[in-house]
């Protein structure tokens, strides 16, 4: 059963844990005259989305908005487009081709999660081009009395964008502002998954988003934080720099990957008073390593 919670004015969410991932994923529904779905997730979540919509008495969707074209955020958009043919699917220009033809998304998902990835995520279907809308940076989508500003936010991925809800001063931030960790979600660590992570662009995006004056951060992995938004963004910037420095030094010094993992884990324990899971470590180190090699620094 879906546990829906109203987290801001007419904004509802539910969280799900996918069998193939360690982190929770958060789906957001905005109940206006026309329904809005932010972060559709993989196709495996479509039945839960439909259950949530039924509870909210939402019969249709006007907009489906994945923040970026990774399977855990956007794998279900094709299935949802079939179910709601009147909906427009908003994607970054850099992600449009992957929405219309998800061949590369399927290949990359299979490479990471194996041949049976559909057992955990469900099928990845194409979105009809007639339903795809590519918003400009800063474009405002009006839904009922609500204004949703689309802001391009690369760094985690080149096709990343966020949604700024002006009515509540909240950012649906995807992974552009890090991943909140810790008991009180006060330790935003960089979402550094390879192969496209670029910490320099990531930091530029964080600075850009800090100027929106957000009061609420609607994370896709970590739920909602309705206080200290400025402080969290500043911490995310600082942690992105510090972890990058530690990982670069450990990689530059050489040694086995186990040694690099140990150094980063020890640093994180001292700095953040918390442990990182093996998946956190692997993805974070790999994301920075791929970036440093791409830049010719390693």
For each of these PLM feature ranges, what is it?
Residues 36, 65, 89, 170-172, ...:
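Residue-level marker for buried hydrophobic side chains located in beta-strands
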Residues 46-94:
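Active-site metal-binding motif and surrounding structural segment of the metallo-beta-lactamase
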Residues 6-9, 42, 99-152, 158-230:
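Metallo-beta-lactamase
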Residues 2-55, 60, 163-173:
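Conserved beta-strand hairpin/beta-sheet module of binuclear metal-dependent hydrolase folds
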Residues 10, 30, 39, 68, ...:
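Divalent metal-coordination and catalytic microenvironments
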């Amino acid at each position: 059963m879906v546990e829906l919670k109203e987290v801001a004015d007419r904004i509802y969410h539910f969280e799900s844990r996918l069998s193939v991932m360690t982190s929770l994923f958060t789906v957001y529904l905005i109940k206006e005259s026309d329904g809005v779905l932010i972060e559709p997730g993989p196709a495996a979540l479509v039945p839960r989305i439909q259950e949530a919509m039924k509870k909210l008495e939402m019969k249709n969707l006007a907009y489906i908005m994945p923040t970026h074209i990774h399977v855990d955020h956007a794998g279900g958009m094709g299935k949802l487009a079939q179910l709601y043919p009147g909906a427009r699917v908003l994607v970054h220009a850099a992600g449009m081709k992957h929405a219309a033809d998800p061949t590369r998304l399927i290949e990359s998902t299979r490479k990471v999660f194996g041949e049976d990835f559909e057992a955990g995520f469900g099928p990845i279907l194409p979105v009809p081009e007639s339903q795809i809308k590519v918003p400009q940076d800063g474009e405002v989508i009006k839904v009922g009395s609500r204004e949703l500003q689309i802001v391009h936010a690369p760094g985690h991925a080149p096709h990343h964008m966020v949604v700024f809800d002006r009515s509540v001063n909240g950012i649906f931030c995807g992974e552009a502002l890090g991943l909140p960790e810790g008991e009180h979600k006060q330790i935003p660590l960089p979402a550094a998954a390879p192969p496209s992570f670029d910490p320099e662009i990531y930091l530029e995006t964080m600075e850009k988003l800090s100027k929106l004056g957000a009061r609420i951060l609607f994370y896709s992995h970590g739920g909602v934080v309705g206080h200290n938004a400025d402080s969290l963004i500043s911490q995310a910037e600082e942690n992105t720099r510090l972890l990058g420095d530690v990982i670069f030094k450990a990689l530059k010094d050489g040694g086995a990957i186990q040694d690099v993992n140990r150094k980063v884990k020890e640093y994180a324990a001292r700095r953040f008073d918390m442990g990182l899971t093996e998946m956190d470590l692997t993805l974070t180190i790999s994301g920075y390593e791929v970036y440093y090699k791409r830049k010719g620094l390693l």
